[in-house]
Amino acid sequence: MNLALIFLITIFSFSLFFYGRSKSKSLSIENNYKLKALPKFYGYYLVLWCSLPSLVFLLVWTLFEPTIIKSIILKIAADQGAIMQDQNAANLIYEKIKAVYLGTYFGDIDSLLKESALSYAKFKNIFTNSKIVLIFLIVISSIIYALKKIKSNNKARDDVEIILKGLLFVSSLIAILTTLGIIFSLLFESIKFFSVINIFDYLFGTNWSPQRAFVRDASSITAAEYEDLKDAFGFVPLIAGTAFIALIAMLVAVPVGLFSGIYMAEYATKKIRRVSKPIIEILAGIPTVVYGFFAALTVGPFFRELGENFGLTVSSESALAAGLIMGIMIIPYISSLSDDVINSVPQSLRDGSYAIRATKSETIKKVVIPAALPGIIGSVLLAVSRAIGETMIVVMAAGLAANLTINPLDSTTTITTQIVMILIGDQEFDSPKTQSAFALGLTLFIATLILNYIALRVVKKYREKYD
């Protein structure tokens, strides 16, 4: 129903654009006055006044309608004798009533559920009809108001710009609030985790085995349980594995991607560039699970057989295989961005270098690269963030074992992989095992924030030097 209403409001609003534009022209001719804005702004004015109030009302109604209906139905059920000891019992009864209404309840339907479901259907119908009527009245009222303003030859452009600025502000506010919501959701769950697990045991522990955590209530934890948990949530193997695989990926992606970008920007002919650049960027569109299959079925076994020929013990799920494939996946990001920033370097800098008889390679090395360095650092930063956040390739190619190792031929794991594995399936959100995923997320967020800050400082330093 809501989608249908949004569709109708949108279609009707945009049709009013043409009416508002023609109406302003006809009023100008009839009353012999000059419009205070272009006719199209009167069309925009009518569109905004028709759509925004009704859409805002629909949003507010949609947010509060379920809560109001739920409180009404639970009150009716309680009056009919439903026993609700706590909120969980009330929620269970309400879900049963909804299931009976939707026809998806397969248990015994007693008179209480039947009557409550009929009441639910009744109030659902009342609320739906009321919503349609109120939205219709809001649309009509808004159109009447907007037409009166148009007839008075208002400054429609100023009004439209004020409304659009308000929409831009709301969009920015939504982005900020979303970020704060993510931070606080991680923070609150992490606080619950650290009320059971000592933060120093977490940060400096060298063993990660969350499957050993069975404690739910931090207030009732015993000394034996605490000692068991103390060695279950060590963060060091995860951050070491994440950094190790990301380092291998960067050792592959940075030189190949940067040299590819330099070649495409400075040496490649238009014909080669027209063919090669799309082929390189195809890599960016391949799903990561495909890279994971390639690493697990081809690259991993290849390294294992190659190592056996040299007398080395190589795991079929190794950090080297995961890092290599991850580096190949990241190459297009560095290559494309490096190409763009190198092409953005002013030609006058190159001409000045050539004027003092510098060669092309000397110009690239001494002039172009330093001038493009902030953008290159930005592309590398994007690649590092991509490598740190990658999950599927590591799951399929590097394994799940949290080994603390610097041997690229051994299996290891990353932070994001462990977050996924912890939250797979139906988990209890009051256990340290599940809450550890939020602690990992918060730690990764802080580490990425520090990395971004350092990178921004470096970019700012070099930009001031070469601008």
Could you say what each language-model-derived stretch is?
Residues M1-I9, N125-S130, L229-A246, R304-Y333:
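Loop-to-helix entry region at the N-terminal start of transmembrane alpha-helices
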Residues M1-S130:
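N-terminal targeting peptides and non-cytosolic leader segments immediately upstream
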Residues I69-I132, K151-V170, L186-L247, T269, ...:
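Periplasmic/extracellular loop-to-transmembrane helix junction in inner-membrane transport proteins
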Residues L247-V252, Y263, K270, R274, ...:
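Membrane-cytosol interface at the C-terminal ends of specific transmembrane alpha-helices
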Residues D339-N343, Q347, Y354, L381, ...:
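C-terminal transmembrane helix and the adjacent membrane-cytosol boundary/short C-terminal tail
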Residues V394-F445:
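Interhelical loop and adjacent transmembrane-helix boundary motif
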